[in-house]
Amino acid sequence: MRRFELKIQRGREVETRIMRANGFGSLEGMAQDMISDDYKITKITITNLATDEVKVVR
């Protein structure tokens, strides 16, 4: 399992979470579900802490 950092942006407020997952796919799906559930979330940035690869979910 790899470690990922999620930055959840709600307007100007940014919440950071460290999560473990096998890859971006499961976290992207979770991020899309979070955005559809919470109208205040504007953007979620997922960063692989090992490789610094970044994906943005809007």
Name the predicted role of every residue range:
Residues 36-58:
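Short, mixed-charge low-complexity intrinsically disordered segments
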Residues 13-25:
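A short, exposed loop/beta-hairpin motif centered on an aromatic-Gly-Thr core
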Residues 1-15:
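Short aromatic-glycine-(Arg/Gly/Cys) micro-motifs in beta-strand/loop hairpins
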Residues 22-43:
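A short, charged, amphipathic alpha-helix used as a generic interaction element across diverse proteins
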Residues 16, 29, 54-56:
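Short acidic, gly/pro-rich beta-turn/loop elements at beta-sheet edges
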Residues 9, 20-22, 47:
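A structural detector for beta-sheet-dominated domains
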